[in-house]
């Protein structure tokens, strides 16, 4: 049995599920050094990715070998202090490329930050992967998403809007809809104060909240249950606030859906 460790869960879902032989221990699944390919060794490539009229900063941990590799996109939270790059190294060691990027208006990327723009950024990164699939050795038939916190919301929303992507991992998903649906206009300033002013460009916390309130249906992931029905989805939480959302998605899912609540903190510090 795979223990409740994020990296082992991801390896099991991404790699083992596509193999015929599963007689491996948890440690042999996880611990694997890279033996460099002499002609196309594993490495890191800096990326400047177009998204609408802006450039977003990113990089790719490229897998070993000149063949095209399946690729995982890491989607950070708000503002995105936990990047999960430890997981990226493990996944790369098992033959996957891993792309990390910063949404528009965050952490040095150009443009305006908004939750809606984050979802569009994922779609534009996928287009970038397709355009440069040969030079970056990306198997565009096998791209998966991994999101944490706000990135969990972005993961599920983008997964619903990208029919060619079949797998998503949503870690401690921020249910923006549930947090905003009962908010009154008179409460916006206080909510913005509690949210704080993070390092984001060309917007404010108050504007972000007002944008959500003006487009609540977009943020209700349960509205996307049909589009997610044939996806493979893993949702992990450290709390029980997403149980209703998870139950709704699971009831509509025809492929694979797993939801678990672990004893940990928001960044899953003891479950790497």
Language model features: what each stretch is:
Residues 25, 157-207:
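Hydrolase active-site cap/lid region
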Residues 25-66:
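N-terminal cap/lid segment of alpha/beta-hydrolase-fold proteins
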Residues 68-77:
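Short beta-strand element of the alpha/beta-hydrolase
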Residues 136-149:
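Alpha/beta-hydrolase fold nucleophile elbow
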Residues 208-272:
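Serine-hydrolase catalytic core
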